[in-house]
């Protein structure tokens, strides 16, 4: 979003009166194949976030007991089948919501599948499958509506919907997670894990909102804006209009 604010819209995206024009993908079939490949890659990312073998015995107070299990990156026990189920439910919810809200637009339908996955990612290992389905649908509605509102209001040309799918849906997913999973432990290795011997904070709405602000704005939008400004000043950000 920070880069797009500096980059500006494509030539012809907005009329002389400022109204946005719809510029569809050049090759809808290639878009379809590409997004299906992204689904597959995202599932691979999910699988890679699981530590295959981990002895949780000592960390759960079971001294002398060996308890091997898969865990997520926060050392919370999980299963590949469980996260795959929620992955597919959020994908399905996203596809359904995208088809309905975009009135069958293929680009938005398939992009919404990815938005659904991303929106439910924050609590994927803890959500009930129906929660994943519903959260995926909610994320798509938010991403779709925000995309067109930002486009009209700020003249931001998000050509491939990346800001909507990853940014708006991702931010919403973190905030939703804080409410749905309020009180759940943030890590399986939370007891006495802090430097002073205290525990990690449990999942809560305020913490997730602050985390979303840090992730998307402090680490994302602001650095992107600064880098784009520097590149633009050097004449390296966009191909000259004459070209």
Regions found by a protein language model. Name each.
Residues 1-243:
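Glycine- and aromatic-enriched membrane alpha-helices
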């Amino acid at each position: 979003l920070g880069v797009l604010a500096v980059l500006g819209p494509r030539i012809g995206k907005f009329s002389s009166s400022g109204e946005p024009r719809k510029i569809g993908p050049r090759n809808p079939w290639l878009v379809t194949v590409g997004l299906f490949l992204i689904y597959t890659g995202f599932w691979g990312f999910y699988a890679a976030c699981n530590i295959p073998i981990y002895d949780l015995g000592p960390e759960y107070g079971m001294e002398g007991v060996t308890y091997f299990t898969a865990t997520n990156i926060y050392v919370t026990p999980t299963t590949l089948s469980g996260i795959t189920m929620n992955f597919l439910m959020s994908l399905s919810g996203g596809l359904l919501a995208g088809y309905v809200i975009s009135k069958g637009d293929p680009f938005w339908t398939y992009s919404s599948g990815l938005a659904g996955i991303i929106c439910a990612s924050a609590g994927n290992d803890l959500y009930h499958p129906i929660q994943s389905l519903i959260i995926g649908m909610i994320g798509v509605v938010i991403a779709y509506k925000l995309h067109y509102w930002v486009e009209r209001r700020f003249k931001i040309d998000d050509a491939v919907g990346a800001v909507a799918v990853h940014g708006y849906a991702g931010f919403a997913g973190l905030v939703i997670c804080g409410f749905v999973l309020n009180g759940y432990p943030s890590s399986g290795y939370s007891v006495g894990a802090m430097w002073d011997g205290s525990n990690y904070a449990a999942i809560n709405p305020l913490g997730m909102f602050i985390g979303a602000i840090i992730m998307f704005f402090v680490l994302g939008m602001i650095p992107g804006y600064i880098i784009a400004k520097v590149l633009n000043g050097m004449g390296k950000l966009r191909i000259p209009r004459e070209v």
